[in-house]
């Protein structure tokens, strides 16, 4: 690997360790020429997963985008970031294990809501109100009634 400081093509690995729950490897390297130290990350190249939106628009799946939506729904709620990251990882893993190249956004939304309902009901309702585009208070009340039924 080329040194980012001097462009020499010889480096040696000083330290390697798994990161991101074993999904990638962090390597600490040193240039054999100038002794500059730098960090690299290695991960498996994944086949793109395409999300088909309600309007038919296609975009690449983004775990970060899903996480941002979850963080917004859980704002000022007692939900740890780690829980939200785990939800995103589980959903992505489940989608990739299906072996399909395209998935509908509705399916992802339902998967998120199922998991969110189990950890925080207020966050679930917040997410559902945006995801399901509640038009009026009656739709909101119906969603709350469904949530109460599921609890029993």
From Swiss-Prot:
Q: Keywords, A to Z?
A: ATP-binding, DNA-binding, Metal-binding, Nucleotide-binding, Repressor, Transcription, Transcription regulation, Zinc, Zinc-finger
- Pfam families noted in UniProt: ATP-cone, Zn_ribbon_NrdR
Q: Return the PROSITE patterns for the record.
A: ATP_CONE
Where on this chain are zinc fingers (unnamed) annotated?
3-34
BP GO terms, sorted: negative regulation of DNA-templated transcription
Outline the extent of the ATP-cone domain.
Answer: 49-139
* Cofactor binding note from Swiss-Prot or TrEMBL: Binds 1 zinc ion.
MF terms (GO), sorted A to Z: ATP binding; DNA binding; zinc ion binding
User: What are the required cofactors?
Assistant: Zn(2+)
Give the family per the record.
Belongs to the NrdR family.
Free-text function comment from the UniProt entry: Negatively regulates transcription of bacterial ribonucleotide reductase nrd genes and operons by binding to NrdR-boxes.
Q: What protein name applies here?
A: Transcriptional repressor NrdR
**Native source species:** Bacillus licheniformis (strain ATCC 14580 / DSM 13 / JCM 2505 / CCUG 7422 / NBRC 12200 / NCIMB 9375 / NCTC 10341 / NRRL NRS-1264 / Gibson 46)
